């Protein structure tokens, strides 16, 4: 008999339409797993709309809505975690829809220590959303060790940087995550800019292996317009610095290389306009050919090449902003703590 019990924590900010759909998919997954009474905690992270009210009006779940000022996802999860009564916690986000049989698959594993920690196989919803194809292409490139051969497997610190992972749809023992959060030291001055995924998962991977399977899946609904995409790209650039600009990570040297060489490339472009115009055309074409050779779908590769320059500019600006937050404003203010 499975002795594992589940609490679900969902940070929510200005997402009244998404939260209802997220909860609906969660209810289906809980029902199919035979645990419909599991504790669900929605943390309204200072929404300026009716997100919290929409969550409270949802029926069919053992649901509590916790309201806080806008402190970001990390603090929302921490405050939600404090209310958890289950042996394990599932972190969800409002744009993430859990697969209907995902919990049914993973639940029997949770009672065994070596299979008690799971990260989801996240599928991007590309229907009518070319921007989602961009992110899927990026994931297929960086996590191709798994993406080219999805299977039930696990990884540890030795191959941590080669597998897709995140705290979205993460299932973990409550006490492990509480310990990870208590040991977490932010490297930026704004909790809303904190990249909790990498630090928390590295902490967990030091103690147990992280499991992943195409049977434990969820769907991510990416932003659908260019403005939101560029804003998100800028944010991802800043949290990349927080999560991976440290010795021992796979991306540490490549990140420093980009940060150092980018100003030089800009100088060359301004010094030789013809060369800059050639680069504007040739580099995206080269990217298209390269990612095709890495197994990326043709349509995804086309979107990646088309958005290469706007993404690169906003992402790079985010990286420099993250560098400033990491080294120029290291102290987190008392108001944010």
Report residues per predicted region.
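Catalytic donor/gating beta->alpha subdomain of glycosyltransferases that bind UDP-sugars
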Residues: 183-247
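Short, well-formed alpha-helical segments that are part of the catalytic scaffolds
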Residues: 15-31
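Short, flexible, basic/aromatic active-site loop/helix in glycosyltransferases
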Residues: 120, 138-163
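Conserved donor NDP-sugar-binding/catalytic core segment of glycosyltransferases
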Residues: 101-133
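Active-site-adjacent helix/loop segment of glycosyltransferases
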Residues: 219-311, 317-321, 337
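A conserved acidic beta->alpha catalytic loop
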Residues: 25, 44-53, 96
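Glycine-rich, basic loop-to-helix element that forms the pyrophosphate-binding segment
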Residues: 68-84, 105
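Short aromatic/hydrophobic "clamp" motif used to bind/position activated sugar donors
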Residues: 89
């Amino acid at each position: 008999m499975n002795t594992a019990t589940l609490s679900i924590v969902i940070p929510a900010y200005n997402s009244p339409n998404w939260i209802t759909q997220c909860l609906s998919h969660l209810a289906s997954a809980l029902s199919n797993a035979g645990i419909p009474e599991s504790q669900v905690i929605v943390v309204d992270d200072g929404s300026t709309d009716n997100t919290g009210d929409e969550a409270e009006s949802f029926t069919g779940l053992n649901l509590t809505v916790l309201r806080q000022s806008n402190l970001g996802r990390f603090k929302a999860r921490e405050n939600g975690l404090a209310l958890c009564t289950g042996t394990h916690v599932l972190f969800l986000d409002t744009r993430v829809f859990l697969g209907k049989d995902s919990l049914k698959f993973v639940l029997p594993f949770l009672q065994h220590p070596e299979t008690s920690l799971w990260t989801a196989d996240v599928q991007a919803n590309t229907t009518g959303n070319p921007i989602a194809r961009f992110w899927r292409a990026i994931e297929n490139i960086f996590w191709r060790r798994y993406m080219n051969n999805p299977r039930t497997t696990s990884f540890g610190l030795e191959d941590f940087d080669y597998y897709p992972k995140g705290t979205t749809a993460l299932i973990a023992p409550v006490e492990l995550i509480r310990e990870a959060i208590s040991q977490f030291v932010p490297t930026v001055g704004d909790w809303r800019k904190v990249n909790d995924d990498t630090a928390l998962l590295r902490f967990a991977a030091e103690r147990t292996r992280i499991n992943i399977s195409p049977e434990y899946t969820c769907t991510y609904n990416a932003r659908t317009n260019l403005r939101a995409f560029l804003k998100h790209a800028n944010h991802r650039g800043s949290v990349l610095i927080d999560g991976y600009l440290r010795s021992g990570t796979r991306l540490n040297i490549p990140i420093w290389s980009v940060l150092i060489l980018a100003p030089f490339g800009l100088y060359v472009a301004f010094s030789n306009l013809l060369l800059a115009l050639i680069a504007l055309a040739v580099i995206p074409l080269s990217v298209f050919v390269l990612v095709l050779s890495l197994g990326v779908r043709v349509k995804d590769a086309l979107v990646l090449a088309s958005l290469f320059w706007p993404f690169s500019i906003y992402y790079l600006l985010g990286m420099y902003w993250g560098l400033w937050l990491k080294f120029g404003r290291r102290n987190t203010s008392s108001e944010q703590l």
